[in-house]
UniProtKB/Swiss-Prot annotation:
It catalyses: L-histidinol phosphate + 2-oxoglutarate = 3-(imidazol-4-yl)-2-oxopropyl phosphate + L-glutamate. HAMAP family: HisC_aminotrans_2. Gene3D superfamilies: Aspartate Aminotransferase, domain 1 (3.90.1150.10), Type I PLP-dependent aspartate aminotransferase-like (Major domain) (3.40.640.10). InterPro entries: Aminotrans_II_pyridoxalP_BS (IPR001917), Aminotransferase_I/II_large (IPR004839), HisP_aminotrans (IPR005861), PyrdxlP-dep_Trfase (IPR015424), PyrdxlP-dep_Trfase_major (IPR015421), PyrdxlP-dep_Trfase_small (IPR015422). Pathway: Amino-acid biosynthesis; L-histidine biosynthesis; L-histidine from 5-phospho-alpha-D-ribose 1-diphosphate: step 7/9. The modification N6-(pyridoxal phosphate)lysine is found at K209. It comes from the Bacteria. Pfam families: Aminotran_1_2. Keywords: Amino-acid biosynthesis, Aminotransferase, Histidine biosynthesis, Pyridoxal phosphate, Transferase. It comes from Geobacter sp. (strain M21). Homodimer. The gene is hisC. This is Histidinol-phosphate aminotransferase.
Length: 350
């Protein structure tokens, strides 16, 4: 009998979006990847590093990547930690701040992986719901949990919380407020200024969406130096390999390419939203690189299966709050045109 911890033996685990091995056979709109390739400068940097540096250990402090991030975000590098995907930072924040039996919280629906990470640590999980107008409900006036995770823009729904609301929430918490800005580059506002204003605010970012680097597993966090120092104590000392560090620095340095990719995705998002609304879909206004859309008959399962049969992958959730709709990533204009055609073929249902 393997001597597993009881909580590990009993937990369900997180289920990521389907990743087909024959990806070229599909229009893949289920995991919010970028339809455009990384900057050519990223590919050049990776090739150079692969040819010269792989026999050496990577820089344990990811100095060059942090320096580029500092230029882009306007913080001293001591306020920044690089990560093997933003999930690494989320995990280490729980490890650093929430002990066994202590509580973390997040909004449901949002990124359910927060709960999985907390379960691994033996922390308790508390969730708060949303009203029909997407207002969080039930959060105490003064919440004393160790961590509160706020996905902004929200995923999978795509709406945003105002910076005034986030600042008010930060002031009501005795623990750390983690603003997960995985999709913020497709939105209009960021909480970075709140990191300076509040000592309990952390902002996390990923390179998987707007920088087209989901396959590299790159992320970062920005917080007060004392919290960054604590996270550095518990991360893997070589958490980013040499290729990832080179890719991160090059991606951050090529802001014109990054901004053009974001512009095209936002433009396609607006077009796709308008097309869906023409034949009766309810679409939540989105600030991410995806939309959450419900067909006229509210049968998300029917549409999901119909698209799957046509080799178009989207994300369907079994949670009763979400099962009526689909989260559809924004691909290239050509991919979205084919998706609109398929949705028209599937019709409004009953």
């Amino acid at each position: 009998m393997i001597a597993l911890r009881e909580n590990i033996a009993e937990m369900a685990g997180y289920v990521p979006g389907f990743q087909p091995l024959d990806v070229a056979s599909y229009i893949k709109l289920n995991t919010n990847e970028n339809p455009y390739p990384p900057s050519p400068k990223v590919l050049e940097a990776i090739a150079k590093e692969a040819g010269e540096g792989l026999r050496r250990y990577p820089d344990a402090a990811s100095v060059l990547a942090r320096e580029e991030a500092a230029k882009v975000y306007g913080f001293d590098p001591s306020w920044i930690i690089m990560a093997n995907g933003s999930d690494e930072v989320l995990n280490n924040l729980i490890r650093a701040c929430a002990g066994e039996g202590e509580e973390i919280a997040f909004i449901n629906p949002s990124y359910s992986y927060y709960g999985t990470l907390a379960e691994v640590q033996g922390a308790r999980v508390r969730t708060f719901g949303l009203t029909e107008s997407f207002e969080p409900e039930g959060i105490p006036e003064h919440y004393d949990g160790k961590l509160f995770f706020l996905t902004n823009p929200n995923a999978p729904l795509g709406f945003t919380y105002s910076q005034r609301y986030i600042a008010d929430l930060a002031g009501r918490l005795s623990g750390v407020l983690v603003v997960d800005e995985a999709y913020v580059d497709f939105a209009e506002e960021t909480s970075l200024d709140l990191v300076r204003s509040f000592d309990n605010v952390v902002v996390t970012r990923t390179f998987s969406k707007s920088y087209s680097l989901a396959g590299m597993r790159l992320g970062l966090a920005i917080a007060r130096p004392e919290l960054i120092a604590a996270l550095n104590k518990i991360r893997d000392h070589y958490n980013l390999d040499r290729l990832a560090q080179a890719a991160a620095a090059a991606a951050l340095a090529d802001q014109p390419y990054f901004k053009e990719c974001v512009r095209k995705i936002k433009e396609t998002r607006a077009w796709f939203t308008a097309e869906l609304q023409k034949f009766g879909y309810q679409v939540i206004p989105s600030s991410g690189n995806f939309v959450f859309a419900s067909p006229p008959d509210r049968d998300g399962t029917r549409i999901y299966q119909g698209l799957y049969d046509r080799k178009i992958l989207v994300r369907h959730f079994t949670d009763p709050k979400l099962a009526h709709g689909l989260r559809i990533s924004i691909g290239s204009r050509e991919e979205m045109e084919q998706t609109v055609k398929a949705l028209r073929e599937l019709g409004p249902g009953r």
